[in-house]
Amino acid sequence: MTAHLKKAELHCHIEGATPPELAVRQARKYGVDTGTIIRDGAYVWEDFTSFVKCYDAVASLFRTEGDYALLAEAYLTELAEAGTIYSEIIVSPDHGNTVGLGADAYLEGLAAGMEAAKARKGIESRMLITGIRHLGPEAVVRTAEYAASHRHPLVTGFNLAGEERMHSVAEFSRAFDIVRDAGLGLTIHAGELSGAFSVRDALDHVRPARISHGVRAIEDTDLVRRLADEGVVLEVCPGSNIALKVFPDFPSHPLRRLYDAGVRVTLNSDDPPFFHTSLAQEYEIAAHAMGFSDGEIDRMTRTALEAAFVDEPTRERLLAALHI
C-alpha cells in the first residue's frame, strides 16, 4: 500500500479531472443531454480522437467562475485527502473563451477553488496554461501572449497539449520563446502518440525543463541517455498510457526502464476519471504492477517537487514537508 506516502502531481488537465457524477450534475444545471458521453457512470470514448471530443463536451459543462471554482476545489480536495501536498493543473483559457466566460474569469474561478482547497486542506497548487496543438501555431501564439501578459500569481508555467500528430514542434517555437521570455516554466506534450523523434524535436526546438509524457523516448537509447544527462523531467502517466493503448499493459510500460537508466521521472494521472485512475492509484500501480519500492516512489515525488514551477521558498517548504 502507498497510502502512507506523500504525493505530488505535475500533470493533470483540470477539465479531465471531472468525475462523471459531477459532469451529470453540471449537465442537469444547463439542460444538456449526456447520453452520448456518459454511459453506466463512465465516460464513453474509443480512441484519442473520440476522447478529445468527449473531453471537450465535458469542458463545455463548466460555464461560470463558480463552476470552475467547484471543479478545482473538488479535485484538489480529493488529492489532499490522498496525501498530496502539491499539484499543478493544466488549464486552457480557450475553454473559457469557448463557453463565453472569458479567459480572465476562467482563471479567477480556478484560482478561487485552488485557494479554497489550500485553506481547507493545506494543499499547494499552481496552474500551467496550455496551448492546443490542433488549433494551430497562430492560436498557440495568441495563448502564449496571453499567458505572458496575464501574470496571475498562480500561473507559473506553459504547456502544449492536444493532437500530437498535427504540426511539427518547430512551428510552435515562437510561442515558447514568448513564454520563456516572460519567465514561465516550460513543458510540452511529446513522446505519447508520436515516437521518440517528437521528444528529440521538443528538446531541440523548445528546450523545456520537463516533457509531458515522453515515454516513447524508450525507443531510442541515445535519447534516453540524453534525457538522463540533461536532467529533463518526464511527467509520466502510466494509467493514461495503457488506456490510450500507447503500451498494451503495465509490464510493458517503460517507467521502470527509464528510472533505471537515470531519467528523472514522476507519477501523474493526466485525465483520471476518463482513464479509470487517480493519482493515488498511479502510486499503487508503481508499487504493485511495476515493483517500485517506497524509497523509489519517494524519490519520484521528490523529483516532482524539485521540478515544480514554484518559487524557491515554496519549493523548500514542500521538500521539508515530504517526510513530516
Curated annotation (Swiss-Prot):
**Binding, substrate:** 271
Q: Where is this site: Important for catalytic activity?
A: 213
Q: How is the cofactor bound?
A: Binds 1 zinc ion per subunit.
The answer to whether UniProt assigns keyword Metal-binding to this entry is: yes
Question: Which Pfam families does the record match to this protein?
Answer: A_deaminase
User: What does this protein do, in the record's words?
Assistant: Catalyzes the hydrolytic deamination of adenine to hypoxanthine. Plays an important role in the purine salvage pathway and in nitrogen catabolism.
Q: What is this protein called?
A: Adenine deaminase
Report the source organism: Sinorhizobium medicae (strain WSM419)
